[in-house]
Amino acid sequence: MNNRKAPCLCMDHLTFTYPEQPSPALRDFSLTIRQGEFVVLCGPSGCGKSTLLRQLKRALAPHGKRGGTILFEGKLLGELDQRTESQRIGFVQQSPENQVVTDKVWHELAFGLESLGTDAQTMRLLSLIHI
């Protein structure tokens, strides 16, 4: 019996090139993350960490040419409906100054819940416990 958990995220031969740039920011990158794994992505400034992570959220993905595949829970990322993507894939910036909507991480998370139609009572409860 195989005890390995199914892949949660698979990036296969991912390549990304920004417009009008001669070389890719990401080149032939492959990664599989299984449910429950904890992964640290580190490297020097400008090596492509943010570019890579932004590929996971269509609303945040930079313009450019992408090759390769990204599977999330066995489905092509581009085929997920917006609600599923919003519910299952989060994105919080390292620096509060770079947050998409607000300047506090918990406000950013609450904005995501609000856009999914979470009721006001649940939102208040989460804000009380700073989640």
Residue map of PLM features:
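Conserved small/polar residues in nucleotide/adenosyl-binding loops
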Residues: 129-131
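Conserved ABC transporter NBD signature motif
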Residues: 65-76, 85
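Helix-to-loop junction immediately C-terminal to a conserved catalytic motif
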Residues: 57
